[in-house]
Amino acid sequence: MTEVRVWQGDITRLAVDAIVNAANSSLLGGGGVDGAIHRAAGAELVAACRLLHGCKTGEAKITRGFRLPAAHVIHTVGPVWRGGDNGEAELLASCYRRSLALAEQAGAASVAFPAISCGIYGYPLEQAAAIAVEEVCRQRPAHSSLEEIVLVAFDSSMAERYQRLLGERPVAR
């Protein structure tokens, strides 16, 4: 069965088969984790993303990882938090489902997720963490090629949320 674990640190340094990028709809880079991934991957990533012609909220697209340790970058566009009554939970869950499906299609054995929509998109951290954990745990039997799913936390507060929801041992750093 697929192992789900928590790791606190810089997602761009993880040696996994695929990392997920919490992108904006243009896929051309932005702030937060999106900007960090684009900077670490190099200019080739922007060129590859231009060919994808953007991405809708809740969907996902894949490129090579270029200068990253990860072979692939899965770009997904999370919802902007608008109070919770505008389909945000389903759109966020869809980001995880579609990203996992692309990881499996690419033959990835390991995939790492940032906290999608938790930066400038303003999703409440507790709710976002619960959706992330629920979706990766629900989807893992369906994605048999995946041996490891890593939930990457940007700080100890988010790491502790994931850890509590997973009921797991201390966070790796």
Curated annotation (Swiss-Prot):
PROSITE patterns: MACRO
InterPro entries the UniProt entry points to: Macro_dom, Macro_dom-like
GO MF annotations, alphabetized: O-acetyl-ADP-ribose deacetylase activity
Lineage top rank: taxon: Bacteria
One Pfam family in the UniProt entry: Macro
Domain Macro: start-end pairs: 1-170
UniProt xrefs under SMART domains: A1pp
Family: Belongs to the MacroD-type family.
Protein name, entry field: Macro domain-containing protein PA3693
